[in-house]
Amino acid sequence: MPSTLTMETYRVKIQRGLIERLGLEILRLNDNIDNEILLITDIENSNLYLQKIIMNLQEYPRNAGMKLRFCELIINSCEDAKNFEAVSNLLEKMAELGLSKKCIVACLGNDVVCSVAGFAARCFSVRLVPVPVTLSAMIEASSGGSALLNLNAGKNLAAMPYAPSLVLCDTECLKDSPCYE
């Protein structure tokens, strides 16, 4: 389903099993990427899904005769971590990894992970593929078109508009999501 709430349109895929096909879905965007993928997630979702993602990322490019560079960064997913310090730390790590401007950032997690990663991806001028795992994050990523950060003065006061390259909402994740999210 296309979303047109921002100046650019982007696709939103909603179905079961998308995490297991994350590599394939991202590599299908291959019109401009350097086959570099940075996955930004939190420790809980890394433990739940990383092995499935790595298996898929290893399988598809090899079958297509492609090479792929894959990196993972773990960030904090609590609401207190949705700030400029987290974005700055993430940008420093992205620069240290030597990522090209053609890489794709995939963010796997709740709305905090998606907002911090989205803000950093926009600042770093790279493409973004949010993979939200909670219902609130799925709604925000699919319809929002901006990454929100908290300031000392209040919650969600800093916004960075963006149009992701693709949003992947794997409904299978909702069964692993805490009820309060």
Language-model segments: which ranges?
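ATP/NTP phosphate-donor binding region
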Residues: M1-C103
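Alpha-helix N-cap/helix-start capping motif
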Residues: R16, I43-E44, D111, V133, ...
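Glycine-rich nucleotide phosphate-binding loop and flanking beta-alpha elements
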Residues: S46-N47, V112-C114, K175
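Alpha-helical elements of the RecA-like P-loop NTPase motor core of helicases
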Residues: L48-Q51, S115, A137
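Residue-level detector of flexible, active-site-proximal loop/helix-junction positions
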Residues: S77-E79, V112, L135
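Glycine/serine-rich anion-binding loops at beta->alpha junctions
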Residues: C103-R122
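A glycine/threonine-rich phosphate-anchoring loop and its flanking beta-alpha core
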Residues: G118, C123-E181
